[in-house]
Design a protein with these regions (language model features):
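N-terminal localization/anchoring segments of enzymes in phospholipid and broader phosphate metabolism
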Residues: 1-165
């Protein structure tokens, strides 16, 4: 069986140009693609080297998203970065972008009001991974569940994804 391998520049050349998403993050993606090509990589995957650049790319893609934002996080804190990205996500939803947010339930404890508020938005869907059955009792419920056979609570979602469809 023949496998066709594409480098990042080849894949980018096949994409239709001119979407809002392309204009917002095109330079950053072209830079990553060029670095992949120089290194002879067969995939277009590259790490973003620092937090500031990663933040900028996420904010730009939220602003440029046209159809959907699919977000998956182990932890989304209420710090400055979390609040700023949350604002960008809410603005995208207000523009009509469908937002799906999947969070690990352990780090969603204590944030029920914020998450419930987001979930009332017609364009935002909030889901919790591996929900705590006794979550109504907060952190005490988590500890009780661990004490009484909460072996499943050790299964956490450590993934992070920010996928925008422009």
């Amino acid at each position: 069986m023949d496998q066709v391998m594409h480098s990042a520049p080849e894949l980018m050349a096949e994409r239709p140009a001119g979407t809002r998403l392309d204009r917002a993050v095109g330079a950053a993606l072209r830079s990553l693609g060029a670095r992949a090509a120089e290194g002879g990589l067969q995939s277009g995957v590259a790490l973003v080297p620092d937090a500031a650049q990663a933040f900028s790319i996420r904010a730009a893609t939220a602003r440029a998203a046209g159809r959907s934002l699919d977000l998956m996080y182990y932890v989304w804190r209420g710090d400055v970065a979390g609040q700023l990205l949350g604002r960008e996500v809410l603005r995208a939803a207000d523009r009509g972008v469908r937002v799906r947010l999947l969070l690990d339930d352990v780090f969603a404890l204590g944030r029920q009001r914020v998450l419930a508020s987001l979930d009332t938005h017609p364009q935002i869907e909030v889901r919790l991974f591996n929900s705590i059955k006794w979550r109504a009792f907060g952190k005490a419920g988590f500890l009780l569940e661990m004490a009484f056979g909460g072996w499943h609570l050790n299964r956490r979602m450590h993934n992070k994804a920010w996928i925008a469809d422009g």
